Amino acid sequence: MTAPDDVCAVVLAAGLGTRLKPLTGLRPKALVPVGNTPLLDRALHRLAAAGLAGAGRVAVNAHHFAEMITEQVGTRAHMSIEDKEPLGSAGAVGNLHGWIDGRAVLVINADAYVDAQPGDLRELLDDWDGRTIRMSGHRADDGHPPFGGLAFAGASLLPAADAAVLKPEYSHLVLTTWRPAERAQRLEAIPLDGTYIDCGTPADYLAANMHATRGQNLIAEDAVVTGAAHSSVIGPGSAMFGVVRRCVLWPGARVDADEVLTDAVRVGRDLTVKVTGA
């Protein structure tokens, strides 16, 4: 499956992840693992399934722990480093003006968990006239969906003309692009056929991992497990000798034989982020 040549993609991975601390004090939000796969890798896989891959078609922006993101991306995408401060969703696109080179832009967030059919992003491209702004949307729980009866689900397709006017300064697409397009009746919300979880808080992050487990355990091949695990994610190189229920063990984490963890994220030997109300 290939995407039209006049479309490129920008993956937003420069967020600070403030609400996800202390986890984001160790790695950027885009690299926290869900189901033992970093969120950024999940985003790049989604784009590849829609026909967008490689440094000529995909760019990733970075700020917080930029060197980690650059290493993770490797040659899979063009890197746009925002050194001084993150530029926001619109500023990130404006900062890539030369690389975009007059193409339409599919902008996706790297910090959300999406479980959908392979190639789901193609739905934003199918039968597109190149003039409307499209966004992926999901049913909102709060009863006040902001866009065409849907809440934003992490992906937006910008016509070339709309992308070209964005500037490399701090700004967000919701104000610069989406709302003006909505007022002009140029905004289309395309329902996401799948699950979308914004991993903004520890509770949401745990929920995304629990969705990925589907009620089972996800255990990395090289993990050592002699204890009892229930609906948990156990990362590469980790050691689990105790009891864990609905937990996430990051790579290299350890749970000793005398420990019982429930609804928690364990990093290393000592850092435990407990989730209340999970």
Description of each model-found segment:
Residues 1-11, 19, 33, 37-118, ...:
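Conserved N-terminal catalytic core of the sugar/cofactor nucleotidyltransferase
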Residues 25-30:
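Short alpha-helical oligomerization interface
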Residues 42-46, 71, 91-95, 119-123, ...:
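A generic local structural motif
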Residues 51-54, 101, 129, 243, ...:
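Short loop/turn motifs at secondary-structure junctions
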Residues 75-80, 143-151, 247:
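Active-site regions of enzymes building and remodeling cell-envelope glycoconjugates
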Residues 105-106, 113-130, 134, 139-215:
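Catalytic-core segments of class I nucleotidyltransferases/pyrophosphorylases
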Residues 207, 211-278:
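Extended beta-solenoid/beta-helix repeat architectures
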